[in-house]
């Protein structure tokens, strides 16, 4: 299985690897630290399921639609 590492810059300008494809899809749902209430989708190991996202923080296993979730993680 091919995993692709992508990089992003943090505010402190260090370059860090993002979660790999496989890692992202294996993370648990995480509503984050804020108190808003946004419907998002996460991959639960079998399929994509809804959860409530607080609006900030959390992890990469959150998607705006079920379709986006399945496109990224459906074959994980």
Curated annotation (Swiss-Prot):
Q: Does the keyword Disulfide bond apply?
A: yes
Show the disulfide pairing. Answer: 25-73, 34-56, 48-69
Concerning InterPro entries, the annotation shows: Kunitz_BPTI, Kunitz_BPTI_sf, Prtase_inh_Kunz-CS, TFPI/VKTCI-like
The residues annotated as site (May bind Kv1.x/KCNA) are 27
Q: Look up the signal peptide feature and give its range.
A: 1-21
| Compartments where found | Secreted
Q: Which SMART domains match?
A: KU
The family database entries (CDD domains) matched by this protein are listed as: Kunitz_huwentoxin
The record describes the protein's role as:
Serine protease inhibitor that inhibits trypsin at a molar ratio of 1:1.
Task: Tell me which family the UniProt entry assigns to this protein.
Answer: Belongs to the venom Kunitz-type family. 02 (native) subfamily.
The protein here is known as: Kunitz-type serine protease inhibitor HNTX-03141017
In its UniProt entry, the species of origin is given as Cyriopagopus hainanus
């Amino acid at each position: 299985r091919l995993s692709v590492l992508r990089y992003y810059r943090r505010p402190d300008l260090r370059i860090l690897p993002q979660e790999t494809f496989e890692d992202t899809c294996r993370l648990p749902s995480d509503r984050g630290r804020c108190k808003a209430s946004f419907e998002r989708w996460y991959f639960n190991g079998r399929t994509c399921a809804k959860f409530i996202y607080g609006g900030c923080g959390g992890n990469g296993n959150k998607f705006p639609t079920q379709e986006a979730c399945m496109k990224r993680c459906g074959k994980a």
